[in-house]
């Protein structure tokens, strides 16, 4: 029996990358996983299939988090499949690598809509569904604590806001024994970092050199930390910012 048997988890942005890794890990450990996706239905189905192939249970739900009312849409989809939630992982996010001189208001607003507004209102409308003793994990970024990539400023700002959300929410939900934490990855090998890691001959080497461990992380490394925080073992950790950058900030 897995540590999450009998529990339901929702992972936003779970059709690929870090989100898929988290969904697969929670599913493998017994959770029934709601695999949220924004547009790529085929990729979401692949995540569901991967969870099921490992002996878990999952279902896909769609909601475009860029627009107003997205959180309500997400929960309407969720309610068709489940009647309560134990673990919420706010993972969905979009980035921007344009320097401040080039980023438009539209792009800025889109990044904040998905990365900040969506998690806030997903939680707001999901509080009555989240069972006592539950877990909330918000996927932040090491860039919230370093100016190593200033062209990612708008993205980093959203993660700073998400960290404040985690901190303050832990006080609000603590009375119900619900923990809330931020998990901050560094450079992880996903399709989002493909250009950075594989776009030049030395991309991977330069990225690995940033880590004290001399490597580039995989989604599984982030998923393992999320699984700990979501488990009974993580019951006394809340309001925290967990560095999963492989020592890139040291």
What residue ranges belong to the model's regions?
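Short C-terminal tail/terminal secondary-structure segment
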Residues: 227, 238-250
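Conserved glycine-rich cofactor-binding loop
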Residues: 8, 15-16
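Short, small/polar-rich loop/turn modules that mediate ligand/substrate recognition or access, typified
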Residues: 174, 179, 237-238
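Active-site helix of classical SDR
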Residues: 123, 158, 166
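A glycine/serine/threonine-rich, flexible loop-to-helix segment
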Residues: 175, 182, 187-211
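Substrate-binding pocket helix/loop in short-chain dehydrogenase/reductase
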Residues: 99-100, 107-112, 207
């Amino acid at each position: 029996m897995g540590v999450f048997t009998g529990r339901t988890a929702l992972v936003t942005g779970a059709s690929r990358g870090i989100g898929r890794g988290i969904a697969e890990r929670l599913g493998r450990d017994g959770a029934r996983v709601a695999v949220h996706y924004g547009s790529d239905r085929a990729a979401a189905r692949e995540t569901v299939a991967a969870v099921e192939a490992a002996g878990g249970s999952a279902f896909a739900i769609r909601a475009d988090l860029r627009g107003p009312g997205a959180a309500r849409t997400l929960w309407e989809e969720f309610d068709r499949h489940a009647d309560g939630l134990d673990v919420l992982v706010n993972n969905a996010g979009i980035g921007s690598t344009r320097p401040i001189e080039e980023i438009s208001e539209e792009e800025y607003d889109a990044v904040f809509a998905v990365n900040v507004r969506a998690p806030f209102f997903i939680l707001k409308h999901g509080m009555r569904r989240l069972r006592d003793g539950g877990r909330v994990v918000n996927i932040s970024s090491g860039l919230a604590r370093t100016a190593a990539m200033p062209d990612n400023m708008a993205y980093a700002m959203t993660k700073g806001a998400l960290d404040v959300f985690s901190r303050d929410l832990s006080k609000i939900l603590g009375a119900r024994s619900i923990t809330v934490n931020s998990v901050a990855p560094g450079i992880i090998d996903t399709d989002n970092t493909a250009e950075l890691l594989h776009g030049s001959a030395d991309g991977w080497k330069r990225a690995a050199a940033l880590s004290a461990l001399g490597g580039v992380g995989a989604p599984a490394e982030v998923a393992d930390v999320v699984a700990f925080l979501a488990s009974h073992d993580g019951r006394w950790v809340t309001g925290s910012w967990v560095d999963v950058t492989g020592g890139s900030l040291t």
